[in-house]
Amino acid sequence: MTSIYPTTSVEKYAYLKYTAHITVATGRTSEALSLEGIKTISDILSKLDKKYPGFKELFMPTGGIFNSKTGIHVKRVGKPTLPISDEKQEIEDGDLLLFW
């Protein structure tokens, strides 16, 4: 049975900020990223790697261990900014991610 009420989907986003050498890799200082099909930081890195080839390897070289010369921090509404050290860290709508 179809609904008589219109269905609307509200797209979810994470907001990305780039600093230092990451701005050189992306050519940007910030952007919004749709979270459609994205659940973890690993998913975000994979999506950004398609857009900016080599991006994922800047943060997680082959072997799956985060690079100690770069970093990713997440800021959630009402919570302190925290570093991400687990590629399975879940990303939420409205998260602000800082890549350096």
Segment roles from a protein language model:
Residues 1-100:
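Ubiquitin-like/PB1-type beta-grasp interaction modules and other compact soluble beta-rich domains
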